[in-house]
């Protein structure tokens, strides 16, 4: 049985008592600001009962934008301001370029051989180059345009057929849409076990979030088993591995044109040609990255964008008017139609500010001792960049908690991590390599949902009754499904 974090922490304390007497935490004169901590568990008690990104942000407001967090055995630095984010992601970018080892990475990501979790070194550099030049290049992202358009149109038809006045579960529809787009991009076609594959990925993403007892007490292997996490991850990995093996074994031979290549085609071509030292497990790890990380982040962003627009009728009217005037009754949307729609892009940027997919950017690890702001940072120290706090820093953002797309009008701030008060995809060497693909998978689906339909809450609910509660997994999702009632907009060939 899988244990809760609270129960796991209690278990951890009990196990540690068997090994040594309780002692106070050691401190030095040259230590970062921190909250009071307990023996063994460190600061974990401050985070029990709250979402990790909100708990860490509350602590940062009290103890500073550069603070120490002791997570069990793991010493951690938390950066919660643009100033310190710039410092660690530029001056100390290489120093903090490693990834900490995790139980999930070991089991699910084929011994940390994917792009996201692989340690800094030659193998990671080759994967990063592969992403830049092949898998996630602008040309490759563009090559998937037709399948994005086709699947978005399928969503429109599905919603139109749902029945007048009936609520639509947009959470489920959007996740399924993005999963289908990415499976076709990854494998060249929809897969026959699509539903099972998607459910397995969902379960992995659910297990990935938060501070897990197995990762905060890495040396106490018994906790990995007692918590149930190792068994659960092993079981889910075996199912996933079997599915991917079936997909690869049924995959057709090489394409005649590189423009027709799926992501799997590219990886198999490079593996067979020995251009990269890729094993079959490496290929599967990278494919899982493309599918898993991309599905969760894009679907969450679309959901949050629609949620914020529902609560802000002024912005909803503005973005729908822009879309409908530009398209002028056109029945089928193509990506070229939305490239110049400035307010749609502002809506997405503001959504990513308030709801970054990874509010605590994927942790890094210190590769060598360094001195940061006069504080000595040992090797293996974990680094968390608190993007949630940075994106809502009132020193940089007026009315920081308010959804206001206009704030980005005539602003040089972009998503690429060059402005450190806005880091939806991180920055530096370990910045998310899939930002361009992710944006493409947000813009077109969102445009379809807003162009073809007007939306309202079911049962006459007031706008302020829309539940905006969060659920922390690999990304921060809505806690409850987004249920909305659509009314079809009349296009040139649709009178419905």
Swiss-Prot record:
Give the source's domain of life in one word. Answer: Eukaryota
Query: What is the catalytic activity of this protein?
Result: (+)-(R)-germacrene A + 3 reduced [NADPH--hemoprotein reductase] + 3 O2 = germacra-1(10),4,11(13)-trien-12-oate + 3 oxidized [NADPH--hemoprotein reductase] + 4 H2O + 4 H(+)
The primary gene name is GAO
Family under the similarity heading = Belongs to the cytochrome P450 family.
Q: Which InterPro entries does the entry mention?
A: Cyt_P450 (IPR001128), Cyt_P450_CS (IPR017972), Cyt_P450_E_grp-I (IPR002401), Cyt_P450_sf (IPR036396)
Pathway as given in its UniProt record:
Secondary metabolite biosynthesis; terpenoid biosynthesis
Q: Which residues are glycosylated?
A: 493
- What are the entry keywords? Endoplasmic reticulum, Glycoprotein, Heme, Iron, Membrane, Metal-binding, Monooxygenase, Oxidoreductase, Signal-anchor, Transmembrane, Transmembrane helix
| A GO molecular-function descriptor | heme binding
UniProt binding sites for heme: 432
Transmembrane regions: 3-23
Principal EC category? oxidoreductase
Q: State the organism named in the record.
A: Barnadesia spinosa
Q: How does it sit in the membrane?
A: Single-pass type II membrane protein
Q: Which residues lie on this side of the membrane: Lumenal?
A: 24-496
Cytoplasmic topology ranges: 1-2
Question: Which GO BP terms apply?
Answer: sesquiterpene biosynthetic process; terpenoid biosynthetic process
Q: State the protein's name.
A: Germacrene A hydroxylase
Q: Report the main location listed first in the record.
A: endoplasmic reticulum
GO CC terms for this protein?
A: endoplasmic reticulum membrane
* Pfam families linked to this entry: p450
Q: What is its EC number?
A: 1.14.14.95
Q: Where in the cell is it found?
A: Endoplasmic reticulum membrane
């Amino acid at each position: 049985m899988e244990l809760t974090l609270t129960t796991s922490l209690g278990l951890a304390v009990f196990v540690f008592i068997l090994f040594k007497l309780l002692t106070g935490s050691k401190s030095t004169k040259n230590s970062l600001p921190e909250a009071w901590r307990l023996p063994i568990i460190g600061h974990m008690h401050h985070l029990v009962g709250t979402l990790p990104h909100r708990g860490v942000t509350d602590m940062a407001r009290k103890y500073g934008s550069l603070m120490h967090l002791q997570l069990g055995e793991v010493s951690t630095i938390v950066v919660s301001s643009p100033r310190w984010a710039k410092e660690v992601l530029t001056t100390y970018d290489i120093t903090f370029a490693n990834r900490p080892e995790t139980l999930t990475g070991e089991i699910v990501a084929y011994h940390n051989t994917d792009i996201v979790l692989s340690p800094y070194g030659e193998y990671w550099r080759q994967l990063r180059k592969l992403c830049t030049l092949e898998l996630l290049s602008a040309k490759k992202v563009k090559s998937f345009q037709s399948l994005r358009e086709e699947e978005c149109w399928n969503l429109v038809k599905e919603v139109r057929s749902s029945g007048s006045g009936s609520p639509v579960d947009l959470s489920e529809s959007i996740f399924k849409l993005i999963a289908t787009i990415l499976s076709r991009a990854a494998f060249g076609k929809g897969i026959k076990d699509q539903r099972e594959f998607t459910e397995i990925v969902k379960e992995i993403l659910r297990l990935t979030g938060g501070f897990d007892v197995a990762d905060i007490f890495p040396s106490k292997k018994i906790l990995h088993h007692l918590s149930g996490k190792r068994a659960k991850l092993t079981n889910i990995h075996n199912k996933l591995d079997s599915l991917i093996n079936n997909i690869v074994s049924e995959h057709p031979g090489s394409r005649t044109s590189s423009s027709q290549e799926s992501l799997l085609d590219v990886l198999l071509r490079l593996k067979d040609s020995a251009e990269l030292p890729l094993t079959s497990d490496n290929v599967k790890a990278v494919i899982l990255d493309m599918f898993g990380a991309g599905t969760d982040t894009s679907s969450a962003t679309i959901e949050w964008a629609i949620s914020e627009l529902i609560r802000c009728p002024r912005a909803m009217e503005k973005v729908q008017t822009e879309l409908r005037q530009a398209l002028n009754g056109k029945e089928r949307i193509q990506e070229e139609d939305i490239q110049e729609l400035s307010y749609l892009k502002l809506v997405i940027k503001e959504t990513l500010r308030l709801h970054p997919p990874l509010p605590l950017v994927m942790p890094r690890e210190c590769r060598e001792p360094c001195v940061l702001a006069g504080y000595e940072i040992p090797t293996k120290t974990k680094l968390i960049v608190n993007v949630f706090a940075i994106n809502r820093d009132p020193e940089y953002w007026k009315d920081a908690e308010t959804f206001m797309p206009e704030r980005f009008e005539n602003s040089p701030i972009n998503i690429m991590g060059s402005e450190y008060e806005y880091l939806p995809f991180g920055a530096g060497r370990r910045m998310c390599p899939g930002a361009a693909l992710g944006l493409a998978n947000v813009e077109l689906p969102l445009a379809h949902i807003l162009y073809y339909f007007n939306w309202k809450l079911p049962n006459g609910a007031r706008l302020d009754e829309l539940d905006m509660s969060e659920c922390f997994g690999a990304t921060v999702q809505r806690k409850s499904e987004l249920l909305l009632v659509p009314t079809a907009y009349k296009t040139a060939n649709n009178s419905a």
